[in-house]
Regions:
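N-terminal hydrophobic alpha-helix used for membrane targeting or insertion
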Residues: 5-8, 76
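Cationic, low-complexity basic patches in intrinsically disordered or flexible, solvent-exposed regions
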Residues: 7-10, 28, 33
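Compositionally biased, low-complexity segments
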Residues: 7, 16-17, 25
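Hydrophobic N-terminal alpha-helices or hydrophobic patches in metabolic proteins across all domains
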Residues: 31-203
Length: 203
């Protein structure tokens, strides 16, 4: 469907240019008690910091918006998909909640992508909880079949998990533990919890 979008309170309303009925997709529901069967997927913004295929670790300054090259990965690994963070969230390690977006083409640092989640990789690093959301672009019809982890090939999940388990291996003072996949419902609950941590810290 080719359409135009507009914000209406907490929703994005997409209207078909041909004039069919509008469909509202919720942007974010911070107090949601967990997904229920038949729910419209939660849509949220992810800011890309590192494009797919890069060994460069870029970080965006949340105050100035500047993109800084933090380092090149010490290992020979490369980011499997675009990697960034969910806006207005706070993870257990004190940073915004991390997200990996399954796009067919890389974007660029600072690009904002409306996403929906399909699962999450529970991890811990030297700073604490370091969970990684696995997302797709909300409007990508090619990925519409991806709704939960069961829809992703098992080998691809293993590749992604392996990357996050080893990409810090050669860096002094860095460590990674864990690496267990959880599904869509658990991931949405963590998004809401991260959003609440952020809002509680900015009252």
């Amino acid at each position: 469907m080719v359409g135009v979008a507009q914000l209406v309170e907490h929703s994005v309303v997409v209207r078909d240019v041909a004039g069919s009925s509008p469909v509202a997709y919720p942007k974010f529901s911070p107090l949601k008690q967990g997904p229920k069967e038949g729910d419209i997927p939660m849509i949220f913004d992810v800011v890309v910091e590192i494009p797919a295929g890069s060994r460069n670790k870029y970080e965006i300054n949340h105050t100035t918006g500047e993109v800084r090259l933090d380092r090149m990965l010490f290992t020979s690994t490369r980011y499997p998909y675009d990697y960034g963070f969910v806006k207005n969230t706070l993870s257990l390690d004190g940073d915004p909640l991390d997200a990996l977006i399954m796009l067919d083409e890389p974007t660029f640092p600072g690009c904002v992508v409306s996403c929906r989640v399909i699962g999450m990789l529970n991890m811990t690093d030297e700073a604490g909880g370091d969970d990684k959301l696995l997302c797709v672009a909300a409007g990508d019809v090619r990925k519409s079949y991806l709704q939960d982890l069961n829809d992703v090939p098992a080998y691809e999940l293993s590749e992604i998990k392996h990357f996050f388990e080893v990409y810090k291996t050669l860096e002094p003072g860095k460590s990674v533990q864990g690496g267990e996949w959880v599904g869509h419902d658990e991931a949405e609950l963590e998004i809401n919890a991260s959003y609440k941590r952020y809002t509680d810290g900015h009252k």
